[in-house]
Amino acid sequence: MSLDVPGKGMDINLRLYLVRHGETDWNVESRIQGKTDIELNEKGRQQAEGLADVLKKGYGIRRIYTSRQKRAAETAEIIGQRLGIRPEVREGLEEINFGKWEGHTWRQVRELFPQEYFVWHGNRRYEVPPEGESYQQLLDRLLPALDNIMRRDRQDVLSITHSAVIMTLMSYLNDTPFEDMARNYKTGNTQIVELDQDLFYQRYKRN
C-alpha cells in the first residue's frame, strides 16, 4: 500500500501488531505501574508462552520490538525464544509515567491527591500527574517510534508495550475522548491489537 507521506512512494506491506505485556503482581493488586519496573509473575510468563504458541502457528512475525521495561522485555524474550527472533528495545514504547501516583490504586490516588486527580481527570490528554507525564507527551514519543518502525521494516512486526500506550494510541487514531479510553479500548495482558496503518498516517500527517 502506498502512502502519501514524507518519503512517498514507499510501499508498506507489513503488519504491525501491538501486544500488552503479561501479568504482574501489581496488575493483580490493581496498583498503578507506569514507569515503575515490575517483573512478570508466573501467570504472566505462562501468558507469554501461550501467546508465543499462537503467534508461531498463525502469524508471520519476523521482528520483535519491546519497551525497555522488565515486564515488556521479559514477555518479548519468552516470545522471541519460541519464534527464534531476538527482541530489540525500541525507545518510545514505554508505559506512561504516572509520577507520584505509581504504586497506589486509583482509589488511593483519589483520596491522597484529590485536587490533582480532579484536574487531571477532566483533561487527561494534556494534564500532567505530579512528577509524571501527560498522555500527549506519551504520544509525542510513541508516534515517531511507530513511524520509524513502519518505515524501516518490510515484514510483519510485533511490538511489546503497555496498556496506556495502546489505549492512548487508539483514542488518538479514532479521535475519541481520552477520558473514555479505559471504557473504549481496555487491553488485557498479552492481548493483540493490529495497527491500522492507513488510519495511522491519515492522523499522523494531519497533526
What is the role of each PLM region?
Residues 176-202:
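Domain-level recognition of soluble alpha/beta enzyme cores
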Residues 3, 14, 23-89:
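Active-site-proximal alpha-helix that buttresses catalytic centers in soluble enzyme cores
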Residues 57-60, 149-156:
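Glycine-rich phosphate-binding loop signature in dinucleotide/nucleotide-binding domains
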Residues 24, 165-166:
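Short active-site segment of divalent metal-dependent hydrolases/proteases
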Residues 11-17:
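Extreme N-terminal starter segment of soluble prokaryotic enzymes
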Residues 66-67, 140, 160-161:
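Short beta-strand scaffold positions
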